[in-house]
Amino acid sequence: MVLAAMLAGLQAASAGDITGKVTLSGTPPPEKVNDLIKNDPVCGKLHSDTVKTAFYVVGKDQGLGDVVLTLKGAPKSSGESAAPVVLDQKGCLYVPQILAIQTGQKLVVKNSDSVMHNVHIVPGADSGNKEANKAQAPGAPDITFAFATPETFLKFKCDVHPWMFAWVTVVDNPYFAVTDENGAFKIANVPPGKYTIEAQHRKANGGKAVTKEIEVTGSGATADFTLEVPK
């Protein structure tokens, strides 16, 4: 046990961060005004500005937001003891729209609106995760979920408000990230070794993942990606 603890300590000491940026190549189609929110008698009043779709979040120097980065070949573990991740229903939208969690990690769904929502989870046909559909009234207690099986872009929707979607990627290790609005990301404290890092966006590259081989040392590693607007 002492030797195992020493080895774990040495590994933690030599762990490094993976940093990088995802850039979008090409011009995405214009985002559309969400007329369903605009014309809804309750949800429309929750927004002072026009609400548009957000399929492509493009920031400084064509940095692409909402890209999920995962690490293949990393040691698998459960996220049961990890801090919960929050998915809010605010302004009749799921916030954030894209997020990632670890298997076993708690996902806490809130309703910050003054209107009824229902949290409808629709897993892939062969994913192994279970469908769920739970109503959540204004001021109702948070609803907590956890998922046992990895899945890419697990769908959350609201049947009351058909424009509401979120997409949750479930990962079997703690080494993942979602790019910010400028395309930047960091995966922290990765054990030293060789890995395959994968970048995936729901729309860019036709939704297909792009991979790179990297080696992480105590100095970390860099992985930049360019994803394309489908032609």
Model-assigned labels for residue ranges:
Residues 1-9:
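Bacterial N-terminal signal peptides
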Residues 13-231:
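Extracytoplasmic copper-binding redox domains, predominantly the cupredoxin/blue-copper superfamily
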